[in-house]
Amino acid sequence: CIMERENNPKMIGSYVNLKTRMSAGDAHYAGELVEGAHIVTAWGDVGTELAIRLFGDESLFVGYSEVRYTAPVFAGDWMEYGGYIEKVGNTSFTCKFFAYKWMKDSKDENGNVINGSGAEMINPPELCAYGTGTLMVAKNLQRPEFGDPKFAADAKAAGAKAFA
C-alpha cells in the first residue's frame, strides 16, 4: 500500500497525511488498545484537507464504502493517517485512506515500557487500516481557485465534470 500512495496513476493531486501519537487517553480497551473509530475520525481530517486542496472548501463526508482493519493500534503508537483523491465527479469525490504505524513503545516481557521511555521505529511501517470514502462539496461552495493548482489540473486532466 505504500507504493500505491506514492506511485498511483489514478491519484488526483497528491497524497496528504497527518501524524500523531496515540496517548493513554486514546486507549479504550484492555491492554491499551485504541478503538478503530479513532482511525476513521483521523481520516475525516485527511478528507477535509483533500477537499480544501481540490475545491477550496472543507466538504461534507458522505460515507465509507469500505473500512478494513489489518493490525491493532495501542497507546504509545505513532500513527500516520493519509489518503488521496482517486475520482472526482461534479460535486463529489472518492478518496483512498490509509493508517500506518511508524513507531511504537519498546516493551519488556512483562509489557512495561523499557526505561519508561523506550521506543522503536517500524521499518517498513505497518499498515493498520485502509478504506474508501466519498466526500462532497455543493457546486455553489466550490472555489478551486483557492485550492492547490495541482489538484485542479489533475482533476481536469482526468475528465472530472466539476473542472470541465
Identify the function of each model-found stretch.
Residues 17-23, 68, 132-136:
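Generic structural detector for well-ordered beta-strands
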Residues 7-10, 14, 74-75, 86-164:
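HotDog/MaoC-like acyl-thioester-processing domains
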Residues 25-62:
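N-terminal first-folded block
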Residues 1, 48, 138:
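Residue-level marker of positions within ordered structural domains that often coincide
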Residues 47-94, 107-112:
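Hydrophobic beta-strand-centered segment that forms part of the acyl-chain substrate-binding groove
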Residues 3-36, 163-164:
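Catalytic strand-loop segment that frames the active site of acyl-thioester-processing enzymes
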